[in-house]
UniProtKB/Swiss-Prot annotation:
Recorded GO CC terms: cytosolic large ribosomal subunit
Function recorded in the entry: One of the primary rRNA binding proteins, it binds directly near the 3'-end of the 23S rRNA, where it nucleates assembly of the 50S subunit.
Protein name: Large ribosomal subunit protein uL3
An annotated GO BP: translation
UniProt GO molecular function: rRNA binding; structural constituent of ribosome
Region named Disordered: 1-29
Family membership noted in the UniProt record: Belongs to the universal ribosomal protein uL3 family.
Pfam families: Ribosomal_L3
Key words of the record: Ribonucleoprotein, Ribosomal protein, RNA-binding, rRNA-binding
InterPro entries: L3_arc_euk, Ribosomal_L3_dom_3_arc_sf, Ribosomal_uL3, Ribosomal_uL3_arc, Transl_B-barrel_sf
């Protein structure tokens, strides 16, 4: 007799599968960091994919020490600017923002995203932080940093993307001193992570709109003979007679894609400053020419071209060893086909 049971089609881990609230991904957790204070994140914009030839430095690999072809993703990473510091406190109900210390003066480009505060008193904000620090109420410090898409030609927008980036390392006083020194200044990816290290990549996936249960959940097509009097691409049943409602686990049609996803332990193969050296003739498909710094990531990442990509140091690197990759060749062949 054949097996009469099987695992359910599709994962319930990401339910409800609805559209992301914002194109800017949000982190709820950050990696642990010891040592000098540092920022734990950065952001860029997805360009496209190509391939490189590099020496396989993975220990015990069948091709160890030999040249292999590796698919890579390129992200354009113009410098970000720190607009403000946000100080958090914790109580029995969780984490709450205590105060914000904004840079003076603010960049005019930032007014496209937020309304610049009028009659802002930075002295009062600093005093509120000092009093909270003396009382032992300060729990975490974050930097409010924003991208500069106006410096890019591949992304047709000028509105900066504003996001929180955690400051870690040392005690709270050292974190504040480090972050305060960054107010109004530009930061680079090389200040956050090094070449050869592993990072977590977070983005909003490609949106596919409303899709049926077959494509959305992977349910089996009804047999041709059984679908003569009805439909072929739908579930065979919506559930039992009791309870008298359709349960949320039943695979049904609905929104597919445009959801936040994180891929862990993606290796940083190269961080370059001259985008022209990696741009193919005619530019990247659906993107164009890279005019700023860029980073080469091993493998694929979520989202279409032009999508905002957030990068943080790997939160669970495990046994991965950080080595400087030996790249022999980067393909700049046109992707036009």
């Amino acid at each position: 007799m054949p097996k009469i049971n099987r695992p359910r089609r599709g994962s319930l881990a990401f339910s409800p599968r609805k559209r992301a609230q914002s194109p800017i991904p949000k982190y709820k957790s950050w990696p642990e960091h010891s040592g000098a204070p540092a920022l734990l994140g950065f952001a860029g914009y997805k360009v496209g994919m190509t391939h490189v030839l590099m020496v396989d430095d993975h220990k015990d690999s069948p091709t160890e020490g030999k040249e292999i072809m590796v698919p890579v993703t390129i992200i354009e990473i113009p410098t970000m600017k720190v607009a403000a510091l946000r100080v958090y406190t914790k109580d029995t109900y969780g984490k709450h923002a205590l105060t914000e210390i904004w840079a003076e003066p603010l960049d005019s480009q930032l007014s496209r995203r937020v309304t610049s505060p009028k009659n802002y008193d930075s002295t009062a904000a600093k005093k509120k932080y000092s009093d909270a620090l003396a009382a032992g109420l300060v729990a975490e410090i974050y930097a409010l940093a924003y991208t500069q898409p106006a410096t890019m030609s591949g992304v047709p927008k000028k509105v900066p993307d504003l996001m929180e980036i955690k400051v870690a390392g040392g005690d709270i006083a050292k974190q504040y001193e480090y972050a305060f020194g960054l107010l109004g200044k530009e930061i680079r990816l090389s200040n956050v992570i090094e070449t050869g290290a592993y990072a977590d990549i977070t983005a909003i996936t490609i949106g596919k709109g409303t899709q049926g249960p077959v494509k959305r959940w992977g349910v089996t097509l009804r047999k041709r003979k059984h679908s003569v009097g009805g439909k072929e691409r739908h579930v065979g049943t919506l559930g039992p007679w009791n309870p008298h409602h359709v349960r949320w686990e039943v695979p049904q049609s609905g929104q597919m894609g445009y959801q936040q996803r994180t891929e862990f332990n993606k290796r940083i193969l190269k961080i370059g400053e001259n985008g022209a050296e990696i741009t193919p003739a005619g530019g990247f498909l659906n993107y164009g020419v890279i005019r700023n710094a860029y980073v080469v990531i091993k493998g694929s990442i979520p989202g279409p071209a032009k999508r905002l990509i957030r990068i943080r140091p790997a939160i669970r690197q495990g046994e991965h060893v950080v080595r400087s990759p030996a790249i022999q060749f980067v393909s700049v062949q046109s992707k036009q086909g």
